[in-house]
A protein has these predicted regions:
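Long, highly charged, low-complexity intrinsically disordered interaction regions
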Residues: 1-11, 20, 221-222, 232
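N-terminal pre-P-loop "Q-motif" helix
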Residues: 255-278, 292
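Short, surface-exposed secondary-structure boundary micro-motifs
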Residues: 64, 117-118, 225, 556, ...
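Upstream accessory/linker segments immediately N-terminal to the RecA-like ATPase cores of bacterial MutS
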Residues: 71-252
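Inter-lobe coupling/hinge segments of SF2-like helicase ATPases
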Residues: 234-237, 277-596, 656-659, 684
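OB-fold nucleic-acid-binding modules
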Residues: 36-66
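C-terminal accessory region of SF2 helicases/translocases
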Residues: 587-684
Length: 684
């Protein structure tokens, strides 16, 4: 007897050849097959009178064949066959290419249902290669048909047949993992009905009922799984830290911290003295002072006898952290080291030795931290910067450097709390919702191409005053013809240097450069050796040049609000007035609304809410960390209400049964373990 783990080759009607084709889509088991959901649907239920047909629409027509197919050859050895179908309202031409093998399929007087796209041809309406079936024996017309994502060698016909065979094979096998009380409370259909109608909807209403059930289940399982991960974290001991006052740290800082920074530090320190490993996200706007929260946690860990590590996504940012933190922490006799992929072998050996013998308190690193030869004597705290560059699995790899270290994650992308659990998984969240005093407001302007000469004159004026300018240009091209990043940016910079700003120094920065090249360009720009830095969005994250007072974004319509806000955050870091100029000629209403928001506020949290409202959570969800189960059917751009429902239901259930050990909840726990297979050991 089959089960959901049965290889699809053993399903009746599929066999070896079709199974090999399905494997290209990641479908190897019966469970994979029924969970391979359609990407859309084609409604073939509406039969229209011929007189009412409009060119461009895909519809069903019921009519009588007016004449046998007439076939003849055309150029290239192809054949064409024609006939006409009539109903009470008019007639429609039917054209078939290369249908010799079916020339007897239609005869005069046959009554059939035809489905296809209507076209105009010399004032007559026609369908080319329509699907057709005898009336009363319909399988692919007169119903809502699924449209599946495909790959080479897999047709819609194959997928439809395979899905039908898969559903027939597992009709009695589908466990309903949702507890009855949850299903009934949220008015959800049974699982068999859901799978049948997500693949082969009986009606648009049945499709909606099925989708609602499956989306809810997916989000409910995800939430329960993450709750179990958090529960597991509470069951292990973290690096021991004693309670102590933070005042000695605060008193020796050269500036006062904001209330929001102190609250975030209190959250983190509370975690560290709890006896459990901290796993906290600290999110705050650009320039809100997240690094000082990290510095406080580093000081607290070192005071408690632990080593610490700070992991940055790029060498530029790692070096910047080192240059900012090392002098600050030296006030507290904390010994810092910078470990990146480009340091020399001798220096690397010395740092590794210092980590192993405990003489280095803080190591600031890029991905080098994850290599096997980096061993710490007593690692107690890991800080990762820019969460979306690292995922659950990478954090797990970091954890292996020590026995469940405290972990603090910094993110400059404010995420609405509704999404935080889904995107950041098992992290607790602290929010820094105020800026340090003196942080410059950046004046922002959204301008069309006609303003370019004035923008260029403004850039010259700033440069003459000794200030510096970022110019960011996105890669412009069709999806399958994206230009070479290096060539595109270099060519644009050359044009600016030779034709627009021959009297200024123009530098180039792009993602194809080697780390040392990027570092050299950024160091030169920070030292004032260039006036203008032309860049791709490599400057989006963390780059700090206080003398840069203007950010010009070309083709600003190609960026999301949150990304534009991150770019704007590269200026306004010094004492001089700063500006952000968004160039775009787009007439799209949504784009204009997005750019208008940028001119109205510098508040990253308001911007993230507007981004969510205008574009849905796709941008946020693109930052979702690796190691969490893939979303197969939920779409958070339209399923936010269901996310709220599912999260509430999951929390209520797990408040009653935190480990899901009650007999009625065990199928749910087993399903969660399957979904979180990469983290299954954490769910034990």
């Amino acid at each position: 007897m089959a089960d959901l783990g049965t290889n699809v080759r053993y399903i009746k009607g599929i066999g070896e050849a079709r199974a090999a084709a399905l494997e290209k889509l990641g479908i190897t088991t019966l469970g994979d097959l029924i969970a391979y959901f359609p990407r859309g649907y084609e409604d073939r239920t509406q039969v229209r009178p011929i007189r009412e047909l409009t060119a461009g629409e895909s519809v069903c027509v019921r009519g009588m064949v007016a004449a046998d197919l007439t076939a003849y050859r055309i150029s290239g050895g192809r054949t064409i066959a024609k006939t006409r179908v009539v109903d009470d309202s008019g007639s429609l031409d039917l054209v078939f290419f290369n249908m010799e093998h079916r020339r007897d399929a239609l005869h005069q007087g046959d009554v059939c249902v035809f489905f296809g796209k209507v076209e105009d041809n010399l004032r007559r309406k026609q369908m080319i290669n329509p699907l057709f079936e005898p009336e009363g024996r319909q399988q692919v017309t007169g119903r809502i048909m699924p449209i599946y994502p495909l790959t080479a060698g897999v047709t819609q016909g194959l997928m439809v047949r395979a899905a039908r065979q898969g559903l027939d094979a597992c009709r009695e096998l589908l466990p309903d993992v949702l507890p009855d009380e949850v299903r009934q409370a949220h008015k959800l259909c049974y699982v068999n009905y859901a799978y049948e109608n997500i693949h082969f909807p009986a009606s648009p209403e049945a499709l909606e009922v099925a989708r609602r059930r499956l989306v809810f289940e997916e989000l409910f399982l995800l939430t329960c799984g993450l709750q179990l991960l958090r529960q597991r974290r509470r069951d292990v001991a973290g690096p021991a830290c004693r309670r102590m006052s933070m005042e000695p740290f605060y008193r020796r800082l050269p500036f006062a911290l904001t209330g929001a920074q102190r609250r975030a530090i209190a959250d983190a320190v509370g975690d560290m003295v709890s006896g459990k490993p901290m796993n906290r996200l600290c999110q705050g706007d650009v320039g809100s002072g997240k690094t000082m929260v990290a510095a406080a946690c580093i000081w607290f860990a070192v005071e408690n006898g632990w080593q610490t590590a700070l992991m940055a996504p790029t060498e530029i940012l790692a070096r910047q952290h080192y240059q900012g933190l090392a002098p600050l922490l030296a006030r507290f006799s904390i010994r810092c080291a910078l470990l990146t992929g480009s340091i020399r072998a001798k220096e690397r050996r010395e740092i590794l030795a210092g980590l192993a013998d405990g003489s280095i308190d803080l190591c600031i690193v890029t991905h080098a931290l994850l290599t096997e030869d980096v061993q710490y004597r007593r690692l107690g705290l890991v800080v990762t910067d820019e969460q979306h560059r690292f995922g659950v699995n990478q954090r797990a790899a970091l954890s292996q450097k020590a026995e469940d270290p405290h972990m603090l994650v910094l993110s400059a992308t404010p995420i609405p709390r509704t999404l935080a659990l889904v995107i950041y998984g098992d992290l607790d969240v602290s929010v820094i919702d105020e800026l340090p005093p003196g942080r410059q407001k950046v004046d922002t302007f959204a301008l069309g191409e006609s303003y370019r000469p004035r923008v260029q004159a403004f850039i010259r004026k700033l440069a003459a005053a000794g200030q510096q300018i970022f110019i960011v240009c996105p890669l412009v091209g069709e999806a399958d013809q994206i230009p070479d990043e290096r060539k595109a940016v270099t060519a644009y910079a050359k044009q600016l240097q030779e034709q627009v700003f021959p009297d200024l120094r123009v530098a180039v920065l792009h993602g194809k450069m080697k780390p040392r090249e990027k570092e050299k360009v950024m160091a030169a720009f920070a030292a004032g050796e260039s006036d203008i830095l032309v860049s791709t969005t490599v400057v989006e994250v963390g780059v700090d040049v206080p003398n840069a007072t203007c950010m010009v974004v070309e083709n600003a319509d190609r960026f999301g609000l949150s990304q534009l806000h991150q770019l704007r955050g590269r200026v306004g870091r010094g004492k001089a007035k700063s500006y952000c100029i968004l160039l775009s000629d787009s007439q799209n209403e949504e784009t204009r609304a997005r750019l208008k928001v940028m001119t109205q506020t510098n508040d990253g949290f308001r911007i993230s809410q507007e981004d969510l409202r205008l574009r849905g959570p796709g941008d946020f969800f693109g930052q979702r960390q690796h190691g969490l189960p893939a979303m197969k059917i939920a779409d958070l751009s339209c399923d936010m209400r269901l996310l709220d429902e599912a999260q509430t239901a999951a929390r209520q259930l797990m408040a009653q049964d935190p480990e899901l050990t009650e007999p009625t909840h065990r199928p749910l726990r087993r399903r969660i373990r399957q979904l979180f297979d990469t983290n299954a050991d954490m769910l034990n």
